[in-house]
Amino acid sequence: MATTKSFLILIVMILATTSSTFASLEEMVTVLSIDGGGIKGIIPGTILEFLEGQLQKMDNNADARLADYFDVIGGTSTGGLLTAMITTPNENNRPFAAANEIVPFYFEHGPHIFNSSTGQFFGPKYDGKYLMQVLQEKLGETRVHQALTEVAISSFDIKTNKPVIFTKSNLAKSPELDAKMYDICYSTAAAPTYFPPHYFATNTINGDKYEFNLVDGAVATVADPALLSVSVATRRAQEDPAFASIRSLNYKKMLLLSLGTGTTSEFDKTHTAEETAKWGALQWMLVIQQMTEAASSYMTDYYLSTVFQDLHSQNNYLRVQENALTGTTTKADDASEANMELLAQVGENLLKKPVSKDNPETYEEALKRFAKLLSDRKKLRANKASY
C-alpha cells in the first residue's frame, strides 16, 4: 500500500513538473537578432535557411516561416534587410521571402549593389541607386505596421544626432515611424563611406511633416542589435495585452537567438602597441571602426551570456558566430562570386562547429534544440487559442 502511495505521489510530481515546464514554454517571448555586415549577410542567411527547414520538418508544414515563431525579429544594416525579407507580407499576407531565398538574393543582387562605384575619393564608395531600386521592387509600398511580427530595425539620424528605432509597438505614440520598408532598409544599410545617407519624410500624429536624415543602423547599435531586440521584446511584454500574463518579463521567460556575420581572429594579431604608438589620425581611422565593432559585439555577447547563465537559463540564449574569418571573407563589400561562395561555405561549415570551447554541442545540434522549443511553444499557444 505504501509502495502504491509513493508511486502515485511520484506520478503526480512528474505531471506537475511537466505541466509547469510546458506552461513556462508557452509563456516564453521569442526573439531573433541579426547582425550587420554587408555581403557577409550570406552567413546568417545560411543559418536561417537551416533553422526554417528544421521547423518545417518538425511541424510537417512546408509553408512554415520564421515570422510564425518569433515575437520579435531585429536587425541592423544587412541584418535589417534580412529582417524585412522574412517579415514583410506578400499579396497572400505571408513573408515575401522564405529563408532559402536569402542566399540566392545576395548572389543575384550583391554584385550590382557593390559594383556601382562613384569613383570619387571624397564621397561614398557606392552610389546606392541599385540598392534602392531592388528594395523598392521587392518591398513595394509596405510600411512598418504591416510587418507580420514585431520588428526592430535601427538607424541613426545625423541631423538630430539620435538613434531611430523602427518598431510596430512605437507607432501608436509615434506614427511618423510608420515609414515605408524600403526607406527603412536603405537607411539601416547606408554605412558611412559605403553609401550616401538617406532622406525621406513622413507625417506626425498632427499631420505635420517629419523629416529623417539617416545612416547605417550600426552607428546606433554597432553591428550587434541583440540588446535592442531584447529591449523591444521587454517593452512589448509590458504593454501588449496579448502578453498580459508575462508583463514581469525576465530573461528566464525569453528565448533569444542571435546571429552574427563573422569576425576575424587575425585582427587581434595584426598590430602591436609598439607599432601603433607611431600612428597618426589617418592610420587609426582605418581600423578604429573595426576595433569598436568587434569590442562592442563581444561585450554584448558577454553580457547576455552572463545574465542567462546567472539565471540558470543558458539554454535560452544562443549566439551563432564565426570567429575565424580570413582573407576576402572579412570584407563587407566583396560581392565577387568566388567570395560569396566562400561565405556560403563558411555558413555551412559553421553548423558543424562546437558552440564554444566549454560546450561541445555543435551549432547544428543547438539549432535543432532551439527549433524544437520554438515548435513546441507555437503548438502550445495554438492549442490554448482553440479553447
From Swiss-Prot:
Residues 1-23 form the signal peptide. A motif (GXGXXG) lies at residues 36-41. Glycans are attached at residue 115. One of its GO terms (molecular function) is monoacylglycerol lipase activity. Residues 361-385 form a coiled coil. Keywords: Coiled coil, Glycoprotein, Hydrolase, Lipid degradation, Lipid metabolism, Plant defense, Signal, Storage protein, Vacuole. GO terms for biological process: defense response; lipid catabolic process. It holds the Pfam family Patatin. Its EC number is 3.1.1.-. Tuber and stolon. GO terms for cellular component: vacuole. A motif (GXSXG) lies at residues 75-79. The keyword Lipid metabolism applies. Transmembrane segments: none annotated. The active site is at residues 77, 216. Patatin have a dual role as a somatic storage protein and as an enzyme involved in host resistance. Probable lipolytic acyl hydrolase (LAH), an activity which is thought to be involved in the response of tubers to pathogens. This is Patatin-02.
